[in-house]
């Protein structure tokens, strides 16, 4: 089984969180994972992935233009039936990350992906729409990113 983590990052913060999520996926065991910046996507690995996690910085309560452009131009990939999840980074808790996550999730559903957030059933961290990493809060944030990755990996194994 394979999981791709796709992200855009200008300052390195979203890239750092993508790598933390990758650590969580690896904790789940028996899943090959690759973390890729949107400008260096391994097309073969992505197409072979059962799960894809999308990550974006939050700008003005929205996704990065790079993520939007990639989604708009990704018709070469058949994502139907794959498990999709999303995470975002923001400088503050009121930065609009929930709206950014919903934007990604809407696009994933249009592409026919199954959408999973990690949910609230397993307790903290509760990820209603996906994982949000707030840059100004550090306590437990790194571990929460790992837990999110592990939960997505476990769901991929359960479904596929």
Curated annotation (Swiss-Prot):
GO molecular function: electron transfer activity; FMN binding; NAD(P)H dehydrogenase (quinone) activity
InterPro entries: Flavodoxin/NO_synth, Flavodoxin_CS, Flavoprotein-like_sf, FMN_Rdtase-like_dom
Superkingdom of origin organism: Bacteria
Keywords, comma-separated and alphabetical: Electron transport, Flavoprotein, FMN, Transport
Coiled-coil zones: none
Residues of the Flavodoxin-like domain: 3-153
Swiss-Prot/TrEMBL cofactor(s): FMN
Gene Ontology terms: cellular component: membrane
Family: Belongs to the flavodoxin family.
Free-text function comment from the UniProt entry: Low-potential electron donor to a number of redox enzymes.
Descriptive protein name: Flavodoxin
Gene: floX
């Amino acid at each position: 089984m394979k999981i791709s983590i796709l992200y855009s990052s200008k300052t390195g913060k979203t890239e750092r969180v993508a790598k933390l999520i990758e650590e969580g996926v690896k904790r789940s065991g028996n899943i090959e994972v690759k973390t890729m910046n949107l400008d260096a996507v391994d097309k073969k690995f992505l197409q072979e992935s059962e799960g894809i996690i999308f990550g974006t910085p939050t700008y003005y309560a929205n996704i990065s233009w790079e993520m939007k452009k990639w989604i708009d131009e990704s018709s070469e990939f058949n994502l139907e039936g794959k498990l999709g999840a999303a995470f975002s980074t923001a400088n503050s808790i009121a930065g609009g990350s929930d709206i950014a996550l919903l934007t990604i999730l809407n696009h994933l559903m249009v592409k026919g992906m199954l959408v999973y957030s990690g949910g609230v059933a397993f307790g903290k961290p509760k990820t209603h729409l996906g994982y949000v990493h707030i840059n100004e809060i550090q306590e437990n944030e790194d571990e929460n990113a790992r837990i999110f990755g592990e939960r997505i990996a476990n769901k991929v194994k359960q479904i596929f």
